[in-house]
Regions:
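A structural motif at transmembrane helix-loop-helix junctions in multipass membrane proteins
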Residues: 164-196, 204
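Hydrophobic/aromatic residues in alpha-helical transmembrane segments
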Residues: 85-92, 140, 172-173, 219, ...
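Terminal transmembrane helical anchor/hairpin motif
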Residues: 9, 26-69, 180, 193, ...
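Long, hydrophobic alpha-helical segments
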Residues: 72-95, 192
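Secretory targeting signals
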Residues: 120-179, 233
């Protein structure tokens, strides 16, 4: 079952990875030209116009845009969070519903294995695919930065790991939600909504202390990119919260899936 599930999801993994790598490739090819001395001055002047709250929200107050690595720290890794978050949400909302959606549920009924095993096999495929996407992006960006100029390697490695913390929780939340329906159309919108709302809440929470509490409702808070940029370390509390939330939603998924009427 694991091999069948892995092969089925391999195509989407390749498509998502290829498109994302193509975007980053364009950045590395075009950035040296865009950031000529004159353009760099213009961008610096433009940045000064932005309110401080906006600069903080996009880490532009602690990361200069005059290099590809600076762009990665301010906007690039936000893009990675969104891409990996959307991919994780879509996979979480689809992977348990594939047979029901395709009207091939008899395949699962005929398997001599428990439903818990079915869930764990599908979860394993999801974890491998999400990790692979993040790993490939990290390796590609490492090569791109090595060619384009100097960068803090330790900081970069930690930044490349942080999307896992938010992506895994997103995956398990959407996986749990999928146990309440039989159609992927219903869960797809919800999963993307969770990602986009989380991003908006996380962005707004960084703009003012009055709304800082919003970050506690966002999965992207777990990635904590700003802390990594400032301290070159990942807050262990975020790792613990990510693992605990993932395990809780996995347990809830198993319980609910075992009770679900498969049609």
């Amino acid at each position: 079952m694991f091999k069948k599930e892995f092969k089925f999801n391999l195509k989407s993994l390749i498509i998502w990875t290829t498109i994302t790598l193509a975007i980053f490739l364009l950045v590395y090819l075009m950035y040296p030209t865009i950031m000529s001395s004159e353009n760099a001055k213009m961008i610096d002047e433009l940045v000064k116009i932005f309110p401080k709250e906006v600069l903080v929200a996009f880490n532009m107050d602690i990361a200069s845009m005059d290099s590809a690595y600076g762009w990665l720290k301010s906007e690039g890794f936000v893009f990675v969070l969104l891409i990996t978050g959307c991919y994780s949400g879509i996979m979480g909302s689809n992977i348990l519903l594939k047979e029901e959606n395709d009207k091939t549920i008899e395949y699962l009924h005929n398997l001599p294995i428990k439903r818990t095993t079915i869930v764990l096999n599908k979860v394993l495929v999801g974890l491998i695919n999400i990790t692979t996407l993040i790993l490939v992006l990290g390796i590609f960006n490492y090569i791109g930065l090595t060619i384009s100029g100097d960068f803090d390697q330790k900081q970069f490695i930690l930044l490349s790991i942080t999307p896992l913390l938010s992506s895994l929780v997103t995956f398990f939340i959407c996986l749990f939600i999928s146990t309440f329906t039989h159609k992927t159309k219903k869960t797809l919108g919800i999963s993307l909504g969770i990602v986009l709302v989380s991003y908006i809440l996380n962005t707004f929470s960084a703009m003012a202390k009055e709304v800082e509490f919003l970050k506690y409702a966002s999965v992207f808070t777990l990635a904590d990119i700003r802390n990594v940029i400032l301290n070159s370390s990942i807050n262990p509390i975020m790792i613990i919260i990510s693992v605990v939330l993932s395990l809780i939603f996995l347990l809830l998924t198993i319980i609910n899936y075992n009770k679900k009427e498969l049609v």
